[in-house]
Amino acid sequence: MLAEKNLKAYSSLNYSILRPTGVYGPRDKDIFIFFKQVAKGIEPYIGNMQQKFSFIYVTDVAQAAVLALYAKGHQKTYNLSDGRYYDRYELGKLIKETLNLKTVKFHLPVNFVKFIAIISEKYSSLKKEAAVLNTEKLDELMAVNWYCDISEARTGLNFAPEYDLKAGVSETLKWYKANKWL
């Protein structure tokens, strides 16, 4: 957000700011962690609240970036997703369906996961490595609503996502298998 604020301070520049939601696809390492757990038959969730998520497949982000490069006279911010929202269980459901698996679904207590995130941060700072789970990432995971409206991107950039979550999960799993990540 600070970079966006600084960019907007130079109002004579043309710019397009892209804000993608949960980006997934080949080579992604963040959401891959969940893919890997589900592939092992484990479907963990943090807490037990209702959540809405938006996702976007990586090639759709690339498409939006190219469209933004050629946008004329813009000084706008665009939210990016596949244009839909999903409940917290949809990603796991689609991974299971695509892999034809059954899983054990369970909910971890929020305070337990917070404790793990704090320990992970401390350990990572000693090792001088990035933590897989930290308190900032946990805050993102705990957000009740990650849904975003992409109507500005549709009209301003002529953005039309090609992949919904089902198609994107299928392509992602093919890549993970072909490259021996799963």
Please report, for each region that a protein language model flagged, where it lies by residue:
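C-terminal beta-strand-loop-alpha-helix "lid" module of Rossmann-like NAD(P)-dependent dehydrogenases
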Residues: 35-38
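Amphipathic terminal alpha-helices
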Residues: 148-156, 160-182
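Mid/C-terminal beta-alpha module of Rossmann-like enzyme folds, strongest
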Residues: 68-132, 166, 170-171
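Substrate-positioning beta->alpha
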Residues: 2-3, 28-33, 47-69, 75-76
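Flexible, glycine-rich beta-alpha linker
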Residues: 13-33
